[in-house]
Every structure is written in structure tokens, then in C-alpha cells.
Amino acid sequence: MYPFAAIVGVLTAIFAYLLHLVLFSNLDYANLIYDQGYSLSWRILAVFLLPFIGIFLSKVFQVLLCGPTFVKSLAPLILKLDRNRDDIPFKDMFTHIISSALSVGFGGSAGLEAPSVLTGSAIGACVSRTLCIQGIPRSMLVSCGAAAAISAVFHSPIAAVLFVVEALLPECTFRTTLPPLIASACSAAFTKIFFSEGIDQAFFMNTIGPWGPRDIIAVLFCGVFTAVIGVLIIKSSIWVGTLSHKIKSPTLRFMIGCTILCVILFLFPMLRGQGYDSIEQLLVGDITALTEAPYQLQWLPPALIPCLILLAVFFLKPAASILTIEHGDGGIFAPTMFIGAFAGFFFAQVFNRLGIGHINPCNFAAIGICGVFAAVMRSPLAAIFLVVETTDCFGLFVPLMLVSGISSVFGRMMEPYSIYKKSLIAQGLISEDPLENRLKRLPVGRCFVSTPVTFKPDMLMADAFSLLKTEAPSYALSCVPVLNADGTLAGLVSLKELYDTTTYTSTTTVEQAMRQPAAVVHDTDTLDKVVKAMNKTKTSILPVLYFEDEKYVGLVSKESIFDKYLR
């Protein structure tokens, strides 16, 4: 198992490098288009149209090559991992590389982390299917690819594993954690050795200053503030997506969405792309990202510019990111970090202006990333190590731990679910209850019992009793199935009635004594459906039928379910 995890890690690192190469080539091409005209009107037109061109090309690529099944969110991946499935198409190994690079490379407002994770997951799934690996969960290498992708992009192997464990995997055990750990380490090592010049670390700053006991109060309040910002991102993202899908025509929805996106990015060019340049500026204390007015807004008073930029970051950036992802491709990972950096920096500036104390805005830019990331992704440990590994600010461990914990707690109070799991839980596909979640993953086939004896409807009850004593003297279930000649279920005979000879005469047939089951389940059902049917009908045993032809398979009881679940 572990050598295969290492293979997935190396392959994912290579594909992540290819994604960045394609992205940078698109950025160069977009800059070439921008520089072709020397007139101001040409450049303004290019700024407005380039995001539309990139998203349009991405959409055409998706429609022609991928069809309507193209997945752009991590929510379906979470569901596949929850169901232990590896049915990810082979083409997903390269489709996200091209699609996301077109969307983001031409100015779309999104990140490349989710496409990288989906690419890595597809690599893991293809390796699993190709090698026909036996004896391990089918989705194990899928999670290895996801961890390896984040590790390669951010050079953060620990945060990658923690994100997979906290946000993607349904359960955290030694067996589920060690393979992603190996894949993540191999991916980071391979990237460091062979691609260190091709993939830049997003932000590696040494301006993070020391913190003191007086900063603790500010950190506590910053945790609450970043929780509010994180919940705002979740709710605004869902609101924009819901509002967009109210437009029934796909063409009209695409045109309106892209027009709104282009207007937002035209007015606030700083929202374009992944936003790592702005994060880097804040981490070194450069307030240019907050004070420099774009050409389109230079007619406004300078004092108004920071307020407009902050409003755009907190309210328009989530909308722009969702529109980019919905109509093109990308992820919410980088936008979350972008908003978090501004949130932390803004909080520090306000705190200092109020005269409560003096805190380092650079420190709080990093702390803000941690807090908002923890609130949006519900991955507090991953948030801590992501900031530590990408900014090298090991001295901020305690403040990061505080803000991550507080933001996660308050974020969960305001919004119970992460941005990825909210839609899955709303559809009833997964549950926050670990017991129910496990039942959703177990098929009926794991728990049903093939009965050693069955009756025919025209049998006499006395003959049925003799048959049971002869064929299955230790029969432990509470009823015996009655089958028709074609193998379909006719009914059930209670074992209590069968043993109580006073309830029937010598001429009583099984058909006269049997009863219809309160409900039936199929071999394709999961155990959560079975338990719900048992609770609804107030029975402890149900017959299982084949889904294809409705023929009898066996019986499933609550005892067998709990026995299987508690193993």
C-alpha cells in the first residue's frame, strides 16, 4: 500500500507542476494581449474582456470534452471518499489543468488548489483501478492524491495531510492517515528536488514579528471577527450560487454571470487571479493593496479608497470567486486566504487606531488567514500548519492555535457546516452524526443473512415445522421466508406461531398463516435506509430483495446491523 501512496505523490507533484506551467503561460499570453495596444482605451477594454475570454474558453473546453458531468467542487470528492468509491474518470487527470488555467490565467477570481486536489484524486483513482490493488479501501489512493496536490502547491506537507483528514475523509484512523502522509511527503520532496524553480512558494516572508502577552486579547477578538468573515463567505457563496441557478437558461445564466464578474474585476482589478501578490504585500506591511486606487476609481477621494477596497474584498470577492468557479473552473481555497489576510490586517489597523494597544499588522495578516480558513473549511489544524509552513512564522504557533480554535467554535455556532459539506448535508447524502454516516457507507450486503430454509405457500404448517426442525434445528431468526415458485417473496411466517401448534390445525397451510412484511429493502440499499425502515415500521427484521428482479435474497436484522457496525 505505502509504495503505491508514494507513486501517487510523485505523479501528483508532476501534474501540479504542469498546472502551474499552463497557468503561467496563460498569464504571459494575457499580458501580451494587454500590452499589444498602447492606447488607454485598448487596455481598459482588455482588462474588461480578458476574464470573459478565459472563462468562455474554459466553458467550451468543458462542454466539448467533459460534458455535463464535469465536477468543479470538492463536495463530490467528499462523497466518494465517504462511500469508499474510486470511480473518478481518467480524463479528470488533465481536464482541470487546462480548464482552471484558462479561467484563472486570464484573470478569473479563483484559486488552483481545488482543481489540483481533483487532479491528484483522479491520479490516485486511476492508479488504484489500473493496478487492481486488493485488500485496501478503494478510496485510499484517492485521498493520497488529494494530500499530495496540496503539498505540491503550497510546499506544506503537514497541512495537506491535516486538510484531507479534517475536511475530506469521513473517519480519522491510523490506517487512513498514514498513506496520505507518505504521499504528501513524497510530493513535497519531489517538488523541492526537481521543481523548486518552477513552483514558487506562495508567500515566504520573514517580516513576522514577535508577539507578547498583550496580544492575546487582540487574538481572541480577531478569532471572533474572522469567524464572522468566514461565515459571510459561506453564506454569500451559497446565496450567489442559488440566485444564479434561478436563471433557467444556461446561456443567459452564463452571459449574465460573466458580465457581472467582468464588471467587478474591471472596477477592482486586485480581485483578479489567486491574489497571492496582495497577500504578500500585507505580510510585509505594504499597504499598497489597501490604498492604491485602480485607474477606474481614481476620481474618488483617496480617503474613500481603502473603505471601498475592503468592502470589495469582503463582499465582492466571494461573489467573483463563485461566478468564476461556476462558469469556468477554480477553487475557493485561495480566495479564502486572500480575504483572511485582509481581514487580519484590517483588524490590526482598527485595533491600533482605537488606542487599545499596538499590535503588528503583519502578524495579524497571517493570523487572519488562519482564522478565516478554519471558519470556512472547518479545518483548524490544517489552518494552523498551512500558515506556519507557507510563511515560516513558527513563532506565532500559540496565537494561531487560539484564533483557529475560537474561529472554528464561533463559526460552527453561526453556520454548522463547512462550505464543502453544507450542500451534501442539505441533500441528506452525508450526516454530521458519525454513527449515521457509517451506516450510510455500509451496504445491506454486509449484514443480511441467507436463511438456510424457506417454505412454500402450499405447504402444511405441520410439514413446515418438521422441515425447520430437520434442516435448521438451531434457526435463530424470528421468522421464516415464504417463497413463490419463481423465487419472489410471498410472505413471512413467525417462528413463534410455527412452534405454537395450538395456533393451527393439521390442514392449515403456510399461506394461511403467513403475514406480509411491514417493509422490504433491496440489496442496493445502505444500512441507514434499513434502520429508518425498521424504526418506522417498529420491526427488528426485514426481508432483502434483489433490486433487479425483486427476488428474495435474505433477511436483515437490527442485531446483525449493530454487530457489524460495532466491530
Language model regions located:
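ATP/adenylate-binding site constellation spanning eukaryotic-like Ser/Thr protein kinases
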Residues: 183, 403, 495, 507, ...
